[in-house]
Amino acid sequence: VTITFVTIRTLDAPLAGFALSFALELSDHISWLLSKYAKLELDANAAERIVEYTQLDQEPQSGIPVPVYWPSNGEIEVTDLCVSYGPDLPPVLSDLTFTLRPGERVGIVGRTGAGKSSLSLALLRCLDARSGSIHIDGIDIAQVRLHDLRSRVGIIPQDPVVFAGTVREVLDPFGQHDDSELLDALTEVGLLRSEDGASGPFSLDATIIEGGRNLSQGQKQLLCLARALVSRPKILIMDEATASIDMESDIRIQRTLRQVVRGCTLLVIAHRLSTIADFDRIIVLDGGRVVEMGTPGELMTIEKGVFRGLVQESGESVVIQQMIHGNTIEL
């Protein structure tokens, strides 16, 4: 079309109309070509990811057998732990050493990038130790079969995993528990009330869409907490589970942790410091190392301490200090 207008000095009306009609069609073809090229790029990225997944090393399935009741106490002993995301990458956790006593409630705090979530991954062997060890009830988890370890340690991640199906199937996918246990768990986390009956939104036969798209973020977290309560693990890890939920759901989770979760070792990686202000101990991470450890009251007495600084910057300083000093906030 451009060549036609440039080479022909005098252009009558019919020829001009003919050229313009082709110009309109050309723009449609160019638009179609660009959209196909963009789709090709997306497909190429998807194919590249699939190839990467096929080349990943499979996790080892071997390991020593453990007693059926393991862990029976919930003691966690971390010794000189060093962890990285790859053999050629710098460590994200270095020389970590601490012991969690059975039934103890411990909060893990620190600034972004301190290594808090990496610790939870190491406890489940999603990241293998470069050096050092983690023992649960005296057994080195590096020697335990992954299925045994991950099926017996409860975890509630920041991004909850909810499958499609009924509430019953989400709470008990293998059908190992009675309906009464499932109903008790839903009631304990506040998702089910006595007046809801069998037709409530969280009755056992209620439908959950894939990914929990028919639930709020807070409801998904509460459902995951109920699932953990059903299995009654001796160790429960919460990885910033209240970071992105509404205040009402946060209050329900805190009430459950304080009034219902008993007899298990509770490890909470905290986004809101009020979540762990009245816990037995606090472990403060910075740069992948333990920089402070003790009761909340002890850490608040450290001048220019990391935990004290986090409390002062939190915007909830008054509430947190009231909880630390025993003035329980009504939930």
What do these predicted regions represent?
Residues V230-K234, G263:
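A short, proline-enriched helix->beta-strand linker immediately N-terminal to the Walker B motif
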Residues L123-R125:
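Helix-to-loop junction immediately C-terminal to a conserved catalytic motif
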Residues L236-E240:
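Catalytic Walker B motif of ABC-type/P-loop ATPase nucleotide-binding domains
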Residues E25-T54:
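Cytosolic ends of transmembrane helices, especially the final helix of ABC transmembrane type-1 domains
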Residues K39, V51-E104, R111, D128, ...:
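Primarily ABC-family ATPase nucleotide-binding module
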